[in-house]
């Protein structure tokens, strides 16, 4: 009896230790750089900070990062000299040049701080596509404002998942969902939906199990699957090759770059690649062209119509059916 109790104690202690060691990189301090007009765009519908905290509480994340807003490079440099910052978010709206200039200057001075850019609307994306090479010298990823403060939660989680991926998958056998999408407009819509679905399923699993007083809900939330974004074929293959045993789903667009060129069959080839690995990994194909439904069926993959008026519901339904957490 004492041996069995010792084993149970050791297992629980081990689980608790692992939970505590997961997600070593946490975004606690975010510097938001936006001129007064762009800042007004996100603040006009209510208290920005309260809404951010609300988004975190909705998914049982009790500690939201602190946002510090500044309107100029000089103000940004002052904050950076005074305290540690985990993530810099630059807003770009009417003035698209100044955020780029600031970003490059900050990258030279603080190369280890991740920078993301948030543009005000979809119409601004065309301009940034023309300067991609310059943009990504200092900016990690571009997102588009979709009217919801949830995009800020997603931006923080995107960086956290990317930074913690290797360690957490090895330490805690954490699961991974791969989203392959090169459209800024669409991944800015998909990621909030995916994170919400992942957090909902994780909470359902946690609350369906006997509660262990030694491990808080907050700690258990750390075992949620990571959502990893790839924007081309090679990035996706890298994730599949390195984290195959952890993958619980691949959601892929059809058309994106492969070997540096736009490939109309890239998503099809990627799912074929997944199938050839021999691992059982549920796959979903997403496309604006409804005729790709047939190709998805041939690959035994689910299909999502990107032009569907019920896109949010469709993603939720398909994710629940095909990406149910183990």
Language-model regions: role of each:
Residues 6-12, 41-44, 48-53, 62-64, ...:
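Conserved phosphotransfer microenvironments
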């Amino acid at each position: 009896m004492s041996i069995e109790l010792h084993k149970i104690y050791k297992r629980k202690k081990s689980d608790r230790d692992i939970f505590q060691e997961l997600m070593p990189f946490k975004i606690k301090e975010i510097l938001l750089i936006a001129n007064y007009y762009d800042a007004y765009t996100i603040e006009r519908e209510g208290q920005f900070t309260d809404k951010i905290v609300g988004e975190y509480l909705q998914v049982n994340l009790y500690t939201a990062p602190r946002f510090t807003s500044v309107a100029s490079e000089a103000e940004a440099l002052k904050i950076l000299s005074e305290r540690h910052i985990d993530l810099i978010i630059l807003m770009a709206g009417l003035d698209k040049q100044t955020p780029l200039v600031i970003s490059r200057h900050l990258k030279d001075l603080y190369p280890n701080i991740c920078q993301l850019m948030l543009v005000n609307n979809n119409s601004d994306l065309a301009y940034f596509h023309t300067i991609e090479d310059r943009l990504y010298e200092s900016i990690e990823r571009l997102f588009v404002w979709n009217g919801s403060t949830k995009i800020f939660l997603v931006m923080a989680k995107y960086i956290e998942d990317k930074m913690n991926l290797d360690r957490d998958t090895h330490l805690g056998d954490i699961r991974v969902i791969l989203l392959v999408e090169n459209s800024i407009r669409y991944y800015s819509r998909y990621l909030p939906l995916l994170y919400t679905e992942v957090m909902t399923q994780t909470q359902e699993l946690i609350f369906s199990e006997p509660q262990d007083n030694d491990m808080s809900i907050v700690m258990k939330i750390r075992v949620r699957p990571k959502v990893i974004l790839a924007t081309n074929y090679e990035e996706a293959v890298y994730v599949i090759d390195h984290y195959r045993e952890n993958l619980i789903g691949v959601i892929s667009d059809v058309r994106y770059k492969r070997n540096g060129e736009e490939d109309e069959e890239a998503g099809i080839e990627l799912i074929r690649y997944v199938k050839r690995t021999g691992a059982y990994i549920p796959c979903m194909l997403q496309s604006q062209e409804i005729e790709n439904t047939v190709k998805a069926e041939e690959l035994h993959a689910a299909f999502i119509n990107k032009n569907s008026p019920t896109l949010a519901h469709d993603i939720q339904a398909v994710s629940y059916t095909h990406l149910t957490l183990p």
